[in-house]
Design a protein with these regions (language model features):
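Short, locally clustered residues in the helix-turn-helix/winged-helix DNA-binding domain
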Residues: 19, 48-55, 115, 143
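N-terminal helix-turn-helix DNA-binding core of bacterial DNA-binding proteins
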Residues: 23, 27-70
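Alpha-helical linker/hinge and terminal dimerization helices associated
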Residues: 25, 29, 67, 110, ...
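Short, hydrophobic-biased segments on the C-terminal half of alpha helices
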Residues: 60, 78-79
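N-terminal leader segment of winged-helix/HTH proteins
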Residues: 1-37, 84, 136
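C-terminal regulatory/oligomerization modules of transcriptional regulators
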Residues: 1-9, 132-153
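Charged, amphipathic alpha-helical coiled-coil/dimerization segments
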Residues: 79-137
């Protein structure tokens, strides 16, 4: 059995900064979305993805991959959004077993109402606090990590 490669001081500082910042930012985002529209962050991300998709619709499997959710977690979120009238399900014309999530007009209006406040929070606590160079470095580092995580599944 190999000994674990413990984190040195620099690595530990980076890890702790990432974890605490992620949780604090996520909390601010959740507070803003809940106050503005009663949405959770995952629900908001679903609305964003659907708004950008052709005809405001996506296959559930593709949507789960995009929002990094398990199929059961996505199904739960879609059910909540459906109850709120923001999303509906439709059968996939090219695959009878496939299910599409479709953004409703009410869902689009909700997104248009909530998005400015969401961007404000993201800017205030992350984007506007970093230089362009820091943003590029962060993007490069996070994409490397994301690729490793996605390819290990």
């Amino acid at each position: 059995v190999m000994d674990p490669r413990w984190l040195d001081a620099t690595e530990m500082a980076a890890w702790h900064a990432f974890v605490s910042t992620f949780h604090l930012l996520e909390r601010r985002i959740e507070e803003q979305l809940k106050a503005a529209a009663g949405l959770t962050h995952p629900q908001y991300e679903i609305l964003v993805r659907l708004s950008a998709a052709t005809d405001h619709r996506m296959r559930m499997t593709e949507l789960a991959r995009d929002v990094v959710a398990s199929k059961s977690a996505l199904t739960y979120q879609i059910t909540q959004l459906e109850k709120a009238g923001l999303v509906e399900r439709a059968h996939c014309p090219s695959d009878e077993r496939g299910v599409l999530a479709v953004l409703t007009d009410a869902g689009m209006r909700c997104l248009e109402r909530v998005a400015p406040g969401h961007v404000e929070v993201v800017r205030a606590y992350l984007i506007d606090r970093l230089s362009r160079e820091e943003l590029h470095t962060m993007t490069t580092a996070m994409r490397k990590t994301e690729r490793a995580l996605r390819s290990s599944h």
